């Protein structure tokens, strides 16, 4: 350990890995990354093998194993939340799906005063900088070709994928060649963070290549218990490792703990709602009532069907076949274990009142829940679906001064009439697609939710019972100008309002969640933050057209 550091990054997850790699490019910067979890060992099949994605969740070796407090609008159910407690964070245990979100997400980010530089034109260059997109042509102006994150375009060669895409067309939608390109709306193959049959986590892409630098130090199993201050100036951190307490000083501390851990540590440090902090015996340093508020997530369900033809991946769940599948991967990074199997899906609008897709479909040629529970069918397939920009909001609060006590949080799923209406639309749209002629040769009947779920009320009751998190918690320390009393972080600097030498860079600072998986936007924000922190000239905005419903021809950018 050094006497002091230029930057201490709390959290070696998605954003922390980007920052550790980028900030240490400047040899004059001494950088320390502190990760509470274990290392992402190269021999660890459960995180390196793409098809093993269901196993780390719920395993204390990799997962914080959070759950909500009883959700008041889901009959008091507690909803489990897997969050990566390992180097790479949730990028080491997630589904490896790469979705930027819709360009209109960023246009919305940029609408409030003070947020103008977060429009799509300013974000696109940073998306491109982080990507190497093997599924796009070199001259594609929407995609990157030289970045650390290597992206595999899903081959989607199982016949069920093509039948699903065709069913989408028969239901009145379109096919799109690249949901991260000109046109998101429609059905087609997805990009995944898989390269040469291995998971591409943020730590593998950014941190590990940089660890040979003498100015970068990465400590795992290092649990940060508090921030250290002189007045409102952060001077360093205290953390525990191997039962011993350590204190390190730094010119700047960057909090990249994620949407749960970042607001937790801020509140423990006296940064949050003053009344709540005083009730726990914590002296407030600054009153920022937005810390832990505006909490967003995506809820999803599985619509599952039995498959009449023996073409699904269902047999790969047979435990007798798993050793052979694993051996194929170990020897050649090939076979069923070399894919995350989320190789295609789509984005659609559930009604004409929304400007851009509010539903996302992940299609799988297998019927299995995220926890590994398989459907009672020899062969099956499913779609994951749910509203993507729900107006339900939750909150997170610490329960005591103890940094090791998990905070309590709730998302208030299904708490608004709009949310419930879009859930009914989501299931009806999914069922309409899955009953089309293109799927007739395979359709062996609906397994879940099943024929007993038909009315709007029955659909909502089923979602209450069966809905799961899509694992996209965000917005709990949202950025915005200081004039917005519920904002926490300055949008131009990532600095916490009213504090010195303290920044937050992770999913918590998103002003609103995007309409897809959030890992890609987090990487983009961290790339951008790295330039801001280093004082580098930002990348020039790229003003380029993108598909807008009602502006472009409805078939613009589609695949015929």
From Swiss-Prot:
Pfam family, one: GMC_oxred_C
Key words, A-Z: FAD, Flavoprotein, NAD, Oxidoreductase
Presence of the UniProt keyword Flavoprotein in the record: yes
Listed GO CC annotations: membrane
Coiled-coil segments on the chain, per record: none
GO terms for biological process, alphabetical: glycine betaine biosynthetic process from choline
Cofactor(s) named in the record: FAD
Record's catalysed reaction(s): choline + A = betaine aldehyde + AH2; betaine aldehyde + NAD(+) + H2O = glycine betaine + NADH + 2 H(+)
Secretion signal span: none
Pathway: Amine and polyamine biosynthesis; betaine biosynthesis via choline pathway; betaine aldehyde from choline (cytochrome c reductase route): step 1/1
Catalytic residues as annotated in Swiss-Prot or TrEMBL: 472 (proton acceptor)
Known EC number: 1.1.99.1, 1.2.1.8
Presence of keyword Cell membrane: no
Residues binding FAD, per UniProt: 6-35
InterPro entries (UniProt xref): BetA (IPR011533), FAD/NAD-bd_sf (IPR036188), GMC_OxRdtase (IPR012132), GMC_OxRdtase_N (IPR000172), GMC_OxRtase_C (IPR007867)
Listed GO MF terms: betaine-aldehyde dehydrogenase (NAD+) activity; choline dehydrogenase activity; flavin adenine dinucleotide binding
Main function: Involved in the biosynthesis of the osmoprotectant glycine betaine. Catalyzes the oxidation of choline to betaine aldehyde and betaine aldehyde to glycine betaine at the same rate.
Annotated family: Belongs to the GMC oxidoreductase family.
Name of this protein: Oxygen-dependent choline dehydrogenase
Organism: Staphylococcus xylosus
């Amino acid at each position: 350990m050094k006497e002091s550091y230029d930057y201490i990054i709390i959290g070696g997850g998605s954003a922390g890995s980007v920052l550790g790699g980028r900030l240490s490019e400047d040899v004059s910067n001494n950088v320390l990354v502190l990760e509470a979890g274990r290392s992402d060992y190269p021999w660890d099949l459960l995180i390196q093998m793409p098809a093993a994605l269901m196993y780390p969740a719920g395993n204390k070796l990799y997962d914080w194993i959070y759950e909500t407090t009883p959700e008041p609008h889901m009959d008091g159910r507690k909803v489990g939340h897997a969050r990566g407690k390992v180097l790479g964070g949730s990028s080491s245990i997630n589904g490896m799906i790469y979705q930027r979100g819709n360009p209109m997400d960023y246009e919305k980010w940029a609408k409030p005063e003070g947020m103008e530089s977060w429009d799509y034109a300013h974000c696109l260059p940073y998306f491109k900088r982080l990507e190497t997109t093997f599924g796009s042509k070199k001259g594609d102006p929407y995609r990157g070709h030289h970045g650390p994150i290597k992206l595999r375009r899903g081959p989607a060669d199982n016949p069920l994928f093509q039948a699903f895409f065709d069913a989408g067309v028969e239901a009145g939608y379109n096919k799109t060649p690249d949901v991260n390109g000109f046109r998101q709306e429609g059905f087609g193959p997805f990009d995944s963070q898989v390269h040469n049959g291995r998971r591409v986590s943020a730590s593998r892409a950014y941190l590990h290549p940089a660890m040979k630098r003498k100015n970068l130090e990465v400590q795992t199993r290092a649990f940060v218990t508090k921030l250290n201050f002189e007045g409102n100036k952060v001077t360093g951190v205290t953390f525990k490792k191997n039962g011993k307490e350590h204190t390190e000083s730094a010119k700047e501390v960057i909090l990249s703990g994620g949407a749960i851990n970042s607001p937790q540590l801020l509140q423990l440090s006296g940064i949050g709602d003053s009344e709540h902090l005083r009730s726990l015996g914590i002296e407030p340093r600054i009153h920022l009532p937005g810390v832990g508020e505006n909490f967003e997530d995506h809820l999803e369900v599985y619509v599952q069907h039995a498959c009449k033809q023996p073409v699904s991946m269902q047999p790969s769940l047979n435990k007798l076949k798993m050793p052979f599948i694993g051996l194929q991967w170990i020897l050649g990074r090939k076979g069923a274990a070399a894919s995350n199997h989320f190789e295609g899906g789509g984005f659609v609008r559930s009604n004409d009142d929304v400007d851009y897709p509010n539903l996302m479909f992940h299609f799988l040629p297998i019927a299995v829940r995220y926890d590994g529970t398989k459907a009672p069918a020899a062969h099956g397939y499913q779609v994951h679906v749910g509203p993507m920009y729900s107006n339900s909001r939750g909150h997170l609060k610490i329960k005591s001064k103890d940094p090791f006590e998990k905070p309590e949080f709730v998302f208030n799923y299904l708490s608004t009439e709009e949310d419930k209406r879009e859930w009914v639309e989501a299931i009806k749209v999914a069922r309409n697609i899955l009953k089309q002629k293109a799927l007739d040769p395979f359709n062996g009947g609906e397994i879940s939710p099943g024929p007993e779920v038909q009315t709007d009320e029955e659909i909502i009751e089923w979602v209450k019972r069966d809905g799961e998190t899509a694992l996209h918690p965000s917005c709990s320390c949202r950025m915005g100008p200081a004039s917005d009393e519920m904002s926490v972080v300055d949008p131009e600097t990532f600095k916490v309002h009213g504090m010195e030498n303290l920044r937050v860079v992770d999913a918590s600072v998103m002003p609103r969640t995007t309409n897809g998986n959030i890992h890609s936007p987090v990487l983009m924000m961290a790339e951008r933050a790295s330039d801001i922190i280093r004082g580098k000239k930002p990348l020039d905005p790229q003003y380029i057209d993108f598909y807008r419903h009602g502006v472009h021809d409805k078939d613009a950018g589609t695949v015929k």
